[in-house]
């Protein structure tokens, strides 16, 4: 059984927390995030620590307990440190460029694919084959990174495509010539 819900979240210095019932808001040096949580979990803030307690022992409440704790931990980390995803592009002629608020990808199609960058994200293209996506909301960063990767997922045969920098690809062998 998971014990995620019982973890105590430390609040770093320079981070402000405001709790109003089931509404949770956190402000830090990188920005602010707020979220409305379930009324079946109780969020407590004391001595620069946040703890989450469930109000009953029903199965849905137990499930929300750990989820709420993890979401709050991600919010606190996001406004203090931020989140970052790095992608790399492999393949001849595959490249990325920034054009205003759009990320343009040449990924082997007859046309370039243009993706609108969400307003709370920062996207950098240090080299045409590297993309760095950063922001304070872990969900938005991960969603946009998955959207970029989904334009041309890496091929298991050739390895060409867009992949996360730390992703290990499982390669397959090609067809054998018949005798």
Swiss-Prot record:
Pfam families per UniProt: Ribosomal_L6
Gene Ontology terms: cellular component: cytosolic large ribosomal subunit
BP GO terms, sorted: cytoplasmic translation
Keyword vocabulary terms for this entry: Ribonucleoprotein, Ribosomal protein, RNA-binding, rRNA-binding
Molecular function GO labels: rRNA binding; structural constituent of ribosome
Family according to the record: Belongs to the universal ribosomal protein uL6 family.
Purpose: This protein binds to the 23S rRNA, and is important in its secondary structure. It is located near the subunit interface in the base of the L7/L12 stalk, and near the tRNA binding site of the peptidyltransferase center.
Subunit structure and binding partners: Part of the 50S ribosomal subunit.
Protein name: Large ribosomal subunit protein uL6
Gene: rplF
